[in-house]
A protein has these predicted regions:
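Sec-dependent N-terminal signal peptides
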Residues: 4-13, 18
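Beta-sheet-dominated interaction scaffolds and their linkers
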Residues: 19-48, 128-144
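Extracellular/lumenal ectodomain signal focusing on beta-strand-rich modules
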Residues: 37, 61-63, 102
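Short, solvent-exposed loop/turn segments enriched in Ser/Thr/Gly
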Residues: 42-48, 95-102
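Asparagine-centered strand-capping/turn motif at beta-strand->loop junctions
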Residues: 51-55
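Surface-exposed binding patches on compact interaction domains or structured appendages
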Residues: 56-85
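Short, hydrophobic beta-strand segments
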Residues: 88-95
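Terminal connector regions
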Residues: 98-131
Length: 144
């Protein structure tokens, strides 16, 4: 009899504590996009994070906020239906140097603490190498 009571309590708890509601899952590993090493003048700095609502209710992104003004995120304006994907665009101002920025996404998702999840960008922006045409001319095989 004790076994039946225990099994009943476990089943009731499983049903009661099952998370219902919207859930956010990002496509990128560790919620991070790696720019790699990019030339300042050859890259717009725009990247897109894709996510899926794996829950059973519409997912609403209420806010996206960057750690600095050099990174400008934009959020979807419409709710994301269960099973559908959404996008968060991130535009980084291509300043020379390392990229290490965090964007906080706030939503009604039940699978992340307080509906917040951090997404990140990383990489390095370099100046385009300057080619010295005079040096090239001196080492040209035709000049020998």
């Amino acid at each position: 009899m004790k076994k039946y009571i225990l099994i009943t309590v476990i089943l009731i708890n499983a049903v009661v504590f099952a998370q219902k509601g919207p859930k956010i899952e990002f496509k990128d590993k560790d919620n991070t996009i790696d720019y790699g090493t990019v030339n300042k003048d050859d890259d717009s700095g725009l990247r897109t994070f894709e996510f899926t609502n794996t829950g059973d209710e519409p997912l609403i992104i209420t806010n996206v906020q960057s750690t600095c003004g050099c990174t400008v995120p934009s959020k979807p304006t419409e709710p994301i239906a269960p099973g559908k994907t959404g996008k968060i665009d991130v535009k980084y101002n291509m300043h020379t140097g390392p990229i290490r920025k965090t964007i906080t996404v706030e939503s009604n998702a039940v699978n992340v603490e307080e509906g917040r999840v951090a997404i990140k960008i990383k990489g390095e922006v370099i100046e385009k190498p300057v080619v010295n045409l005079l040096e090239k001319k001196k080492t040209s095989p035709m000049m020998q």
